[in-house]
């Protein structure tokens, strides 16, 4: 997605009914999957690498739909019309996680496997702080809009660029606090990750969550 469509979506989506936004996202995803392009090719390659088989057209379309719906959910989370998104969250084990954070920050190593903004918003709405790291995207104005959205939901965001380390900053920010620190660990952008088996190949994953 380029900045112009996303910028327009930031302004328009929160004013529309949730079902309309999600229907538009599904339609756009079907069109994108059919047209193809660099993003679709990369997604197809990643799916094949994880599963060992080339995804079918239906599987690829479902994956694209999930990806686009994630963006749509993000845009709706800060609006009154997006309230059903939080009402639909079920967090098994949250009480234990919240209790553990009373003794200090709890670090979670996560993968790119779901709508973590939705989960983070739910956690903040239930009285527990979130501190996390987000990759800086271009242009900066787009990144700032995503940061503002997440901060509006109660999360604290530390931006990180490719090749940059925010490890010390993160430690200083969370030390001694009763917060949850969810970190996406299945992709390294610092250049100092750990090589591991992932799917049918090798991949660099972030070392930060384990080090914390």
Residue ranges and their predicted role:
Residues 1-110, 143-148, 154:
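Membrane-anchoring hydrophobic helices of lipid-metabolizing enzymes
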Residues 81-212:
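Soluble catalytic domains of membrane acyltransferases
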């Amino acid at each position: 997605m380029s900045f112009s469509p996303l910028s327009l979506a930031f302004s328009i989506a929160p004013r529309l009914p949730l079902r309309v936004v999600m229907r538009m996202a599904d339609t756009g995803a079907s069109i994108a999957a059919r047209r193809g392009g660099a993003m679709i090719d990369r997604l197809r390659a990643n799916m094949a690498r994880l599963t060992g088989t080339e995804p079918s057209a239906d599987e690829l379309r479902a994956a694209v739909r999930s990806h686009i719906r994630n963006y749509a959910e993000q845009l709706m989370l800060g609006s009154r019309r997006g309230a059903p998104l939080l009402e639909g969250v079920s967090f098994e084990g949250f009480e234990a996680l919240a209790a553990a954070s009373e003794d200090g920050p709890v670090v979670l190593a996560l993968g790119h496997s779901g709508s973590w903004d939705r989960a983070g918003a739910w956690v903040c709405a239930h009285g527990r702080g979130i501190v996390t790291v987000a990759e800086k995207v271009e242009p900066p104005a787009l990144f700032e809009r995503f940061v503002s959205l997440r901060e509006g939901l109660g999360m604290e965001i530390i931006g990180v660029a490719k090749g940059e380390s925010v490890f010390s900053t993160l430690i200083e920010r969370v030390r001694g606090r009763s917060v949850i620190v969810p970190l996406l660990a299945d992709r390294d952008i610092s250049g100092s990750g750990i090589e591991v088996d992932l799917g049918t190949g090798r991949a660099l994953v972030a070392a930060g969550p384990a080090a914390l």
